[in-house]
Amino acid sequence: MVDHISPRASPGPIRSSQTRRARKLRDSCTSCASSKVRCTKEKPACARCIERGLACQYMVSKRMGRNPRAPSPLDSTRRPSESLPSARSEQGLPAHNTYSTPHAHTQAHTHAHSHPQPHPQSHPQSNQPPHALPTPNGSSSVSAIFSHQSPPPPVETQGLGGDLAGQEQSTLSSLTVDSEFGGSLQSMEHGNHVDFLAESTGSLFDAFLEVGTPMIDPFLESAPLPPFQARYCCFSLALQTLTHLFPHAPLGCQLRLTDGEDSSCNLMTTDMVISGNKRATDAVRKILGCSCAQDGYLLSMVVLIVLKVLAWYAAAAGTQCTSTAAGGETNSGSCSNSPATVSSGCLTEERVLHLPSMMGEDCVDEEDQPRVAAQLVLSELHRVQSLVNLLAKRLQEGGDDAAGIPAHHPASPFSLLGFSGLEANLRHRLRAVSSDIIDYLHRE
């Protein structure tokens, strides 16, 4: 007896994974895409990621349309009855299949009886089950289509006990119709509705896992949003320093807490201004010594800190026009306890209490206090001078980096002209404060 060949072993139009196209990478790397900046498209690492020390990764771009479906691992274990010959085939009886063609039925009846029958469908055998009869609108149309596309059966398989099953299985394997689709139709026509539902659900679920699974960006997954809490870095240090330079900012603010806290104007003395500015300049020097100083936004905050330090020095020297009198009383009454009476200038101007006090280790009387304060501030301006020189160097480096970036690009807050304007503004402000103090001392 000739061994029956399994339909899974017969060669067919099996799609190979090697014929798939090579996956195409995205034009922009993950870091540039998340920052919404133009990527230089250099692989394996772009120039922007190399400059900033970031991990440059190019993700796989998702092609349009459906991906070619890979063979499911469930095909080998889904229907074992298809790969094994049936008991009726071993005993010489024809196996019934809803995909059988009229030509195959004719050969089966010719092998079972000695005389040929022209219309085997109209005279079924008595030992066949009723559900194997072809329906007028169901299996007959499908059989007609498959018989039109199927090749003639091999000659060496005719006359054997399992010839019908082998012919039908070879016919099904040579068709271009999906095997899962054919198995589902066969289950429906045989009444196996439970198997049909299980197979269709599994195939749809496999297709969803292959096509519909979204691609997760590893950069966003590895770098979640930080919680709203205090973090020690150059940005937090700059913000904290800038906040300390605005002690009167809560006055008149609509967002401040109103649970009975004191909103009176706490005036600062000359010693407090000098010590506070010294801490601010030390913090700025630490920031400029860090690699974070290459960021344009951080440099903008540092420029604001230096300008505020110069404003406090001018107020402590008495060369700035303020609303504070020599005795600490205001001429407009803008520093009352009521927030509604606080003027807009009281929130931002630097108000220093000029009273006879201890300046360093010496006690100064009321007459010599303005002159001593001006001399003390003038001796402290060298800190700001060295700080401005260091900041100008950083601004020049930031301007060189921003030279190839358009003015409207969000990678930097200022263009090349903007950075040069910041440096010119700082030097002009420093010269103005020092010249005002020198002129004041000459008049005294």
Swiss-Prot record:
Composition-biased stretches (Basic residues): 106-116
UniProt-recorded Gene Ontology molecular function terms: DNA binding; DNA-binding transcription factor activity, RNA polymerase II-specific; zinc ion binding
Gene Ontology, cellular component aspect: nucleus
Disruption phenotype: Significantly reduces the expression of clustering genes involved in the biosynthesis of aflatoxin resulting in a subsequent significant decrease in aflatoxin production. Produces relatively sparse conidia and a very small number of sclerotia. Also affects the expression of genes involved in spore germination, sclerotial development, and carbohydrate metabolism. Does not affect the biosynthesis of cyclopiazonic acid (CPA).
Cross-referenced Gene3D superfamilies: Zn(2)-C6 fungal-type DNA-binding domain
Composition skew (Low complexity), residue ranges: 120-130
Organism superkingdom: Eukaryota
Residue ranges for the DNA-binding region feature of this UniProt entry: 29-56
UniProt-annotated stretches for the region Disordered: 1-25, 64-174
Keyword Plastid recorded: no
Gene Ontology biological process terms, A to Z: aflatoxin biosynthetic process; positive regulation of metabolic process
Keyword field: DNA-binding, Metal-binding, Nucleus, Transcription, Transcription regulation, Zinc
Compartments (UniProt record): Nucleus
Compositionally biased residues, Polar residues: 136-149
SMART domains, A to Z: GAL4 (SM00066)
Transmembrane intervals: none
Job description of the protein: Transcription factor; part of the gene cluster that mediates the biosynthesis of aflatoxin, a polyketide-derived furanocoumarin which is part of the most toxic and carcinogenic compounds among the known mycotoxins. Binds to at least 17 genes in the aflatoxin biosynthetic cluster, leading to the activation of an enzymatic cascade reaction that results in aflatoxin biosynthesis. Promoter regions of several biosynthesis genes are bound by aflR in a dimeric form with a 5'-TCG(N5)CGA-3' binding motif. AflR also recognizes 5'-TTAGGCCTAA-3' and 5'-TCGCAGCCCGG-3' binding sequences.
Subunit structure: Interacts with aflS.
Designated name of the protein: Aflatoxin biosynthesis regulatory protein
Gene, per the UniProt record: aflR
